[in-house]
């Protein structure tokens, strides 16, 4: 049975057909509508899936935000704009006439990355560092989603009680400091207004402020990982996302994690499926009927 997998992110929409063998084919991508209105998202999703839907028997969605009763929610409403409470499952069922499931994108990616691990690993955590910071937890070989879909939203744990206010309403969340948006928000002077991609480029060119911003992000993530190790006793942590996979970033996280007491050390791995983990994880969950 073929699954039409869809990944809804802050900057892009992706879709692909995924067979029972887990192979990704006919992958398509569009920018996430800038207007962030329900109408714009529905139109973009229609354009994305219309060439693929005839070849699939079901739809599996991995989306930013919390998925509750098939609709979009978020701890940080800024990540969704006008899409809060968007009826995601209902919309795709109407567009495709196919049975549809939906799950948070980081939870989906965690499941895909877990399947790719070698060895006898039953407990792992996936962290995505991108526009925001999200995650997914596998414990005892099972993906934790929670009754309200909140499990794994580790970007909203406390990093600095005196830090910036996060869009979720808390002060000093990991996401407000370590994410691409957090990196950009802290930029000053000639870097003010630059996005995270530009800041990484400038860091590679030797810009001291840019390097400090990236180190601040990596140090914050390392402390989060130490907390995760203490909380879950996971066997490894897999890091993905556009910031997490940026050149040199994971090495910085490893450097700062090594400065923590040995009990909080854990193996760090770069995401195996990189930017397709959400697509594949949603399809795998649909195939296993685990939602």
From Swiss-Prot:
Gene Ontology terms for molecular function: ATP binding; N-acylmannosamine kinase activity; zinc ion binding
Enzyme Commission number(s) of this protein: 2.7.1.60
Any one Pfam family here would be: ROK
Catalytic reaction equation(s): an N-acyl-D-mannosamine + ATP = an N-acyl-D-mannosamine 6-phosphate + ADP + H(+)
> Which positions are annotated as binding ATP?
5-12, 132-139
What are the BP-aspect GO terms?
N-acetylneuraminate catabolic process
Superkingdom as given in the UniProt entry? Bacteria
InterPro entries with a match to the protein in the record? ATPase_NBD (IPR043129), ManNAc_kinase_bac (IPR023945), ROK (IPR000600), ROK_cs (IPR049874)
PROSITE patterns documented for this protein = ROK (PS01125)
Keyword Nucleotide-binding applies: yes
Name the pathway it acts in: Amino-sugar metabolism; N-acetylneuraminate degradation; D-fructose 6-phosphate from N-acetylneuraminate: step 2/5
> What intrachain disulfides are recorded?
none
Residues that bind Zn(2+), according to the entry? 156, 166, 168, 173
Q: Which UniProt keywords apply?
A: ATP-binding, Carbohydrate metabolism, Kinase, Metal-binding, Nucleotide-binding, Transferase, Zinc
Spell out the Gene3D superfamilies in the cross-references.
3.30.420.40
Keyword Aminoacyl-tRNA synthetase recorded = no
User: Which family, according to the similarity comment?
Assistant: Belongs to the ROK (NagC/XylR) family. NanK subfamily.
Q: What does this protein do?
A: Catalyzes the phosphorylation of N-acetylmannosamine (ManNAc) to ManNAc-6-P.
User: Could you tell me which HAMAP family the record lists for this protein?
Assistant: ManNAc_kinase (MF_01234)
PANTHER family noted in UniProt: N-ACETYLMANNOSAMINE KINASE, ROK (REPRESSOR, ORF, KINASE) FAMILY
Q: How does it associate, per the subunit comment?
A: Homodimer.
Protein known as? N-acetylmannosamine kinase
Q: Which organism is it from?
A: Escherichia coli (strain ATCC 8739 / DSM 1576 / NBRC 3972 / NCIMB 8545 / WDCM 00012 / Crooks)
Q: What is the lineage of its organism?
A: Bacteria, Pseudomonadati, Pseudomonadota, Gammaproteobacteria, Enterobacterales
